[in-house]
Regions:
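Short, acidic, metal-binding catalytic loop of nucleotide-sugar glycosyltransferases
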Residues: 22-31, 280-290
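A short, conserved alpha-helix in the catalytic core of glycosyltransferases
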Residues: 163-166, 173-199, 228, 360-364, ...
Length: 512
């Protein structure tokens, strides 16, 4: 596989350009070619360096005047001989084995797009909080929804040349967001997009470079927004592109199509005050009116609980109750609720949830309605306003865990992740929306192996194995008074049962 590295050059300080070029020359992979496109540089040092550079593996293209990064890059793409194009900035560096590892992935997976992790580094012209070698950008596996929130892929990006040309190449009107615009178009041509999880790209951040201060690029933000809006039009997605919490971050807000019905299923046993808090919050904090509440009573005995049920059934036809008198088996109770639900979509909700924002239901429904989506999860807070749930990752804790658990509620999270709609491995069953027919087709929660623990994560991984994407949205928010409802795994019997379920989970999902 020949990989052609394209570097548009414009008035680059000579030592930085030397760093970039030498990092390519030091590659352990032999089948590379470097194309330097001089975009009308006027700096003497830059021109001198290029004039003195003689290497059969390096081609120099001289543009008489500056045409901007998109046209300069596309000029390189058009002249490239390789099957694959690697995009690199003129002041950055590649790790010595970067291209070797990329080539291995291409051969192993027949990928069309490969992206790697990266580190930032400072040129010491100013004190960076995180020192000389800065924050590593460790990225997730390909996440179509995170890509609609921002360009999380950035560097190193390697794309099959044929894909770039098929997508229409780089477009000058998107200078500053040209990679993002191209990526969105390429992602419509292929899903063979592979994440190589090693930091093989070193991104220079300096006073002279605008990459340190994202606020210095308002045009880049607007062009990114325009690229996204055009992507929605091409994909025929009714919706709008809003700015999220920071520059270069977006929220694609999709239109809810029609008025689908939603049934919110709440399993409970007594604890009437908590149940009342949960249902009252739903009734007063939900703007969408096409929902009903179905309480599944698992053996309540308190008089106050029975009075509360009577009260709701008298006062509103939006709330009804059914009973299932069996020993506590969360999966069985939830499945029983879904069997009796009448909605197009169901929301599984613990009785210790208290919804916060009035548009929480639309924020989940806009994604649950999509044919490619499995389960949709919400942003849940502990009562002290720290994060309880923002998606579930496999492999942390005993079997799976919550990244960002207990961090301050307003904190943006790692690389702003707490403010972005994104695909995740799993979401919690404490507040999960899913299409009713998808729930049934997947066979619901597993009542045999996962009576109490692991059932939501197991369910999500089964959805994923059917090719569906699970999704976290920060735009549906609720308090979760966690495990107040049934207590923690705090007795020897509970511990034994929990360990058994974890073992069964690890066996079934060894590949995950």
């Amino acid at each position: 596989v020949v990989i052609c590295v394209i570097v548009p050059v414009h008035n680059t300080p000579k030592p930085w350009l030397a760093d970039a070029v030498n990092s390519i020359r030091r590659q352990t992979y032999p089948h590379w070619h470097l194309l330097l496109v001089n975009d009308g540089s006027t700096e003497v040092g830059t021109r001198e360096f290029l004039d003195n550079l003689n290497d059969p593996k390096i081609t120099k293209i001289q543009l008489t005047r500056s045409v901007g990064i998109s046209i300069a890059t596309q000029t390189g793409v058009d002249a490239a001989h390789g099957d694959f194009i690697a995009l690199m900035d003129h002041d950055d560096m590649l790790a010595p084995d970067a291209l070797k590892k990329v080539a291995e992935i291409i051969q192993r997976h027949q990928s069309d797009v490969i992206y790697t992790d990266e580190t930032t580094f400072s040129d010491r012209t100013q004190e960076k909080r995180d020192g000389y070698l800065g924050l590593p950008h460790l990225k997730p596996a390909y996440s179509p929804d995170l890509l609609l929130s921002h360009n999380y892929i950035t560097h190193l990006l390697v794309i099959r040349k044929e894909m770039i040309q098929r997508a229409g190449g780089f477009r000058a009107e998107f200078d500053g967001a040209q990679d993002y615009d191209l990526l969105l178009r390429v992602a419509e041509q292929t899903d063979k997009i592979f994440h190589l999880s090693e930091p093989l790209y070193h991104w220079r951040q300096s006073v002279q470079s605008t990459s340190l201060d994202t606020g210095a690029k308002p045009l880049a933000h607007l062009r990114g927004q325009k690229a996204l809006s055009e992507a929605l039009e091409r994909r025929k997605i009714p919706g709008e592109v809003l700015t999220a919490n920071a520059p270069h971050f977006f929220r694609v807000r999709r239109k809810v199509l029609g008025r689908p019905s939603v049934e919110i299923i709440i399993p409970f046993r007594d604890q009437p005050l908590m149940l009342r808090q949960c249902i009252d919050a739903l009734m007063s904090n939900t703007r969408y009116d096409g929902f009903r509440v179905l309480g599944v009573d698992n053996g309540s005995v308190e008089a106050l609980t029975l009075e509360l049920k009577d009260h709701y059934e008298r006062e509103t036809d939006q709330v009804r109750f059914i009973s299932l008198d069996v020993p506590f088996n969360f999966s069985q109770i939830v499945n029983f609720g879904v069997q009796h639900a009448k909605g197009d979509h169901v929301v599984l909700m613990n009785n210790d949830i208290e919804v916060i924002n009035v548009d929480w239901l639309e924020a989940m429904l806009e994604h649950s309605q999509r044919p490619e989506i499995g389960a949709v999860g919400a942003k849940l807070y502990y009562p002290d306003d720290t994060i309880q749930h923002a998606g579930i990752a496999i492999g942390i804790g005993d079997y799976a865990g919550h990244p960002h658990k207990h961090v301050e509620g307003g904190y943006p999270g790692y690389l702003n992740r707490l403010h972005n709609i994104q695909n995740v491995s799993a979401v919690t069953g404490a507040m999960m929306m899913i299409k009713r027919d998808v729930y049934d087709a997947a066979g619901g929660f597993d009542e045999q192996l996962f009576k109490i623990a692991c059932n939501d994560v197991d369910f999500c991984l089964r959805l994923r194995s059917k090719g569906l994407l699970n999704l976290f949205t920060p735009y549906a928010q609720a308090y979760h008074h966690e495990s107040v409802s049934r207590g923690y795994e705090d007795t020897p019997e509970k511990q034994v049962r929990f360990q058994g379920e974890v073992e069964a989970f690890r066996k079934r999902h060894a590949e995950a």
